């Protein structure tokens, strides 16, 4: 058979044209070792710190991803995000050229997701239009605005003595089983109708505990404006470490668009332990309490992203779509202490990063004072400027009464006969302590809280038995709602008390007291 050169060239041309070639040049490496979710990879020359690496697919047919953390001379140390049992020595690893990203946007509201933003609530896929990187630089000094708007938690002892402002970082610290999560959940429930989107990040908790939190939020109607990011105790240390940054990125989406968001990290002690585990497996040198040297930076770079940003920042970020609006991300990090030791490594770090702390004490909790907040050592460094005038006007006396009561109560144990003034202070302090008790999942509006504080400050509760104080308060609230609804609406709207309102409130409390038996 004679072959014509023209035919051969035509055949080669058609073959070349029909070739579906790929111009996808990817840096590839080989797995050298796999231990406890840590993979050593050889041959990745152009990998970035924090880059996503693509590993072979698992049982579900989806590729597994890892996070490059250690960049050494001839190998890369990476953590696998998720299952790693199917990865073996000699497998091919590819660079993706992307930093780890999670879905963001309003589509996530009302859903429970894992640390990578994948739904785990069985309600179908999340069709988020955007993704964003989990590691971002916090807003600079010029982009920030001072904290001067209140974020009401609805908890009397916090809003009166340790107020929180929008854009603040307020630490909740205490031993296990002192009600730390309950305080944070109450704060989320109280944001209903306040225009605040909430993100609850559960790190290293039991799946049953997270389920209970989600159920409580659903019953209170709070899931309508809340995203839950869950990294349970059964998930890898890498997922627990990443989850806080994922939640923060989801919150920043709202902050950068001139909206307000609240994020709860429950809790950062477990995140630090997860990071310690990852670091030790990567053979990084251990420091104090075996934590790596950068554990302070771990939390500071996370909490610095919670801020109030000014209108110029929002306008520049949205390219002029949103004008004249400031955005905020308020953080309530939780830290668990061991036997009340706040001088341990991680607690002291987070105390120094945050703008104040709420101390919860086991002794108060066991004595039935719940929320078990120690007002003496709890402080809010910037929230005072953001406190509502109504509560601020009534709370000065409360803090003084409590401080004097604690001091005198210690002496009164040894003194047999007390003068009249001391007796009065002890009685007032006992009533204030009783009044600051509050049931879980029952946050108060600004007006009702102001009315309670007003009543105790004006002496209306001085002749009521201590055990009757909460019943008096509950009855007063019901009376005000039914008979003085207009006054309550006015106080809630203005968040301040003028002379007319004060006179009406005085008359209302006096009228109720006559009927209270």
Curated annotation (Swiss-Prot):
Superkingdom: Bacteria
Keyword NAD among record annotations: no
InterPro entries, per the entry: ATP_synth_asu-like_sf, ATP_synth_asu_C, ATP_synth_asu_C_sf, ATP_synth_F1_a_nt-bd_dom, ATP_synth_F1_asu, ATPase_a/bsu_AS, ATPase_F1/V1/A1_a/bsu_N, ATPase_F1/V1/A1_a/bsu_N_sf
Alphabetized SUPFAM superfamilies for the sequence: C-terminal domain of alpha and beta subunits of F1 ATP synthase (SSF47917), N-terminal domain of alpha and beta subunits of F1 ATP synthase (SSF50615), P-loop containing nucleoside triphosphate hydrolases (SSF52540)
Principal subcellular localisation of the protein: membrane
Annotated TM spans: none
Catalytic activity from the UniProt record: ATP + H2O + 4 H(+)(in) = ADP + phosphate + 5 H(+)(out)
Any one GO MF annotation of this record: ADP binding
GO cellular component: plasma membrane; proton-transporting ATP synthase complex
Compartment annotation: Cell inner membrane
Purpose: Produces ATP from ADP in the presence of a proton gradient across the membrane. The alpha chain is a regulatory subunit.
Subunit structure and binding partners: F-type ATPases have 2 components, CF(1) - the catalytic core - and CF(0) - the membrane proton channel. CF(1) has five subunits: alpha(3), beta(3), gamma(1), delta(1), epsilon(1). CF(0) has three main subunits: a(1), b(2) and c(9-12). The alpha and beta chains form an alternating ring which encloses part of the gamma chain. CF(1) is attached to CF(0) by a central stalk formed by the gamma and epsilon chains, while a peripheral stalk is formed by the delta and b chains.
PANTHER family: ATP SYNTHASE SUBUNIT ALPHA, MITOCHONDRIAL
Name of the protein in its database record: ATP synthase subunit alpha
Species assigned in the record: Delftia acidovorans (strain DSM 14801 / SPH-1)
């Amino acid at each position: 058979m004679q072959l014509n050169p023209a035919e051969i060239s035509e055949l080669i041309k058609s073959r070349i044209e029909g070739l579906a070639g790929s111009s996808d040049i990817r840096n590839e490496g080989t797995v050298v070792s796999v231990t406890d979710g840590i993979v050593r990879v050889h041959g990745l020359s152009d990998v970035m710190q924090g880059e996503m690496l693509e590993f072979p697919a698992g049982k579900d047919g989806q590729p597994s991803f890892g996070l490059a953390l250690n960049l050494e001379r001839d190998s890369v140390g990476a953590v696998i995000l998720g299952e790693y049992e199917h990865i073996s020595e000699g497998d091919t690893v590819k660079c993706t050229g992307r930093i780890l990203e999670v879905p963001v946007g309003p589509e996530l509201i009302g859903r429970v997701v894992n640390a990578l933003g994948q739904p785990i609530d069985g309600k179908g896929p999340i069709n988020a239009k955007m993704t964003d990187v989990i590691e971002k630089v916090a807003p600079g000094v010029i982009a920030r605005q001072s904290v001067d708007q209140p974020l009401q938690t609805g908890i009397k002892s916090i809003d009166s003595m340790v107020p929180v402002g929008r854009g603040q970082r307020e630490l909740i610290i205490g031993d296990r089983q002192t009600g730390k999560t309950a305080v944070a959940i109450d704060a989320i429930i109280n944001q209903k109708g306040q225009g605040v989107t909430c993100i609850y990040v559960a790190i290293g908790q039991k799946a049953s505990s997270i389920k209970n939190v989600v159920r409580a939020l659903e019953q209170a109607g709070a899931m309508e404006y809340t995203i839950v990011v869950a990294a349970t105790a059964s998930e890898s240390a890498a997922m627990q470490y990443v989850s806080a940054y994922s939640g923060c990125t989801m919150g920043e989406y709202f902050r950068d668009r001139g909206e307000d968001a609240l994020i709860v990290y429950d809790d950062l002690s477990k995140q630090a332990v997860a990071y310690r585990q990852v670091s030790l497996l990567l053979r990084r040198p251990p420091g104090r309490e075996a934590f790596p040297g950068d554990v302070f930076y771990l939390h500071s770079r996370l909490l610095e992203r919670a801020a109030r940003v000014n209108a110029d920042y929002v306008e520049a970020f949205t390219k002029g779509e949103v004008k004249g609006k400031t955005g905020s991300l308020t953080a309530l990090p939780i830290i668990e202490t061991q036997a009340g030791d706040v001088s341990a490594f991680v607690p002291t770090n987070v105390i120094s990063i945050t703008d104040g702390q709420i101390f919860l004490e086991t002794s108060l909790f066991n004595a039935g004072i719940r929320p078990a907040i120690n007002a003496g050592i709890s402080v809010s460094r910037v929230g005072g400027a953001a406190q509502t005038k109504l509560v601020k006007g009534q709370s000065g006396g409360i803090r003084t009464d409590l401080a004097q009561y604690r001091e005198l109560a210690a002496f009164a144990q040894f003194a047999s006969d007390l003068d009249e003034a001391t007796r009065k202070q002890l009685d007032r302090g006992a009533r204030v302590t009783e009044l600051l008790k509050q049931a879980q999942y029952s946050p108060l509006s600004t007006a009702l809280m102001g009315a309670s504080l007003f009543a105790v400050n004006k002496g209306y509760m001085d002749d009521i038995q201590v055990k009757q104080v909460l019943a008096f308060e509950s009855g007063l609230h019901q009376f005000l709602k039914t008979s003085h609804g207009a006054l309550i609406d006015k106080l809630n709207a203005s968040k301040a008390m003028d002379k007319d309102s004060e006179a009406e409130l005085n008359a209302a409390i006096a009228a109720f007291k006559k009927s209270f038996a």
